[in-house]
Curated annotation (Swiss-Prot):
NCBIfam families: frr. This is Ribosome-recycling factor. Pfam families: RRF. One of its GO terms (biological process) is cytoplasmic translational termination. Responsible for the release of ribosomes from messenger RNA at the termination of protein biosynthesis. May increase the efficiency of translation by recycling ribosomes from one round of translation to another. Coiled coil: none annotated. InterPro entries: Ribosome_recyc_fac (IPR002661), Ribosome_recyc_fac_dom (IPR023584), RRF_sf (IPR036191). It comes from the Bacteria. It is found in: Cytoplasm. Belongs to the RRF family. It comes from Actinobacillus pleuropneumoniae serotype 5b (strain L20).
Length: 185
């Protein structure tokens, strides 16, 4: 039973870490990354469709993304979707390819982005601590139902804490890497 709780805890913490990585990968660093445009929805036959389903996005160089639209009739809709997104990008089309130059980040904008990254990191740590609390509650319930001894409860909580510490450390590493990425460019 305790092993199931530990496995579930680890799985949930891993999902929290992956969610954090996904969130902060969308934060623009000044370096062209195709994932930057992942959140963009294009109006396609009356419904919002993810850009990834309508076009191929590649990094042309360090400061330019190339969006190769599969259906030429959608070029203006894709261009409009990129322009109206909150990313502050100014696309230009050349044939079937839309080029999206990334403006350099100002020092002030970098500081703002670092604050956002730290906030996302704190949310990730909170999610991990909530998972720990749930696991500890499950362990206490086992003790209350007399399915485990107090020694087993203490040992299990210590193991859960070690898992938690490991994931909090991973969150810190992800944040440090993103901050370095924001400051280095």
């Amino acid at each position: 039973m305790i092993n199931e709780i530990k496995k579930d805890t680890q799985d949930r913490m891993e999902k929290s870490l992956e969610a954090l990585k996904s969130h902060i990968s969308k934060i623009r660093t000044g370096r062209a990354q195709p994932s930057l445009l992942d959140g963009i929805q294009v109006e396609y036959y009356g419904s919002a469709t993810p850009l990834r389903q309508l076009a191929n996005v590649v990094a042309e160089d360090a400061r330019t993304l190339a969006v190769n639209v599969f259906d030429r009739s959608l070029i203006s809709a894709v261009e409009k979707a990129i322009l109206t997104s909150d990313l502050g990008l100014n696309p230009s089309s050349a044939g079937a390819t839309i080029r999206v130059p990334l403006p350099p980040l100002t020092e002030e904008r970098r500081r703002d982005l670092i604050k956002i990254v730290k906030g996302e990191g704190e949310q990730g740590k909170i999610a991990i601590r909530n998972v720990r609390r749930d696991a500890n509650d499950q362990i206490k319930a086992l003790l209350k139902d007399k399915e485990i001894s107090e020694d087993e409860e203490r040992k299990a909580q210590d193991e859960i804490q070690k898992i938690t510490d490991g994931y909090v450390k991973k969150v810190d590493e992800v944040l440090a890497a993103k901050e370095k990425e924001l400051l280095d460019f």
